[in-house]
């Protein structure tokens, strides 16, 4: 198997591709996280046939990247840059994405969802770095 992205085990739709392309998580890190967390499989299932050392190095990088992302979110909350309104919007977005990402959706519907995500993320980002007088 060439890649997890070609696997029938993953509903690798346009939305997942969009999110992965814009995330701080690499494709390899995503594959590790997905196979371990979602599929419940480890090194023996590695679709890239990586060496054991390379697999566990990538696993460590994945953990470190996820920790950094979580600390970044907590930092933004701590300085009130990510306020309750933004967190509420993100929670709603998370709930919708978790439903949509597990379905087979056509490109037109995916494009609509992606447009909404882009708009909300752009607005939240703008609000986070807005100059307050």
Stretches found by the model and what they are:
Residues 89-100, 113, 117-127:
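Amphipathic alpha-helices that form helix-helix packing interfaces
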Residues 72-104:
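Intrinsically disordered, low-complexity basic tails/linkers immediately adjacent to helix-turn-helix/homeobox/MYB/SANT
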Residues 63-70, 74:
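C-terminal flanking helix
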Residues 28-36:
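Short alpha-helical "packing" element that flanks the helix-turn-helix/winged-helix DNA-binding module
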Residues 7-22:
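Short, Lys/Arg-enriched N-terminal segment that forms or immediately precedes the first helix
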Residues 39-51:
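Helix-turn-helix DNA-binding module
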Residues 1-7, 76:
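N-terminal leader segment of winged-helix/HTH proteins
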């Amino acid at each position: 198997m060439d890649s997890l992205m070609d696997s029938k085990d993953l509903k690798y739709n346009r939305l997942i591709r969009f999110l992965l392309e814009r995330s701080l998580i690499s494709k390899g890190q995503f594959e590790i996280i997905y196979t371990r967390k979602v599929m419940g499989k480890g090194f023996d299932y590695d679709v890239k046939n990586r060496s054991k050392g390379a697999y566990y190095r990538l696993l460590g990088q994945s953990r470190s990247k996820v920790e950094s992302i979580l600390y970044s979110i907590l930092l933004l909350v701590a300085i009130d840059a990510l306020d309750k309104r933004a967190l509420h919007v993100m929670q709603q977005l998370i709930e919708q994405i978790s439903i949509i990402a597990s379905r087979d959706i056509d490109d037109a519907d995916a494009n609509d969802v992606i447009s909404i995500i882009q708009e909300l993320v752009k607005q939240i980002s703008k609000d986070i770095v807005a100059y307050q007088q």
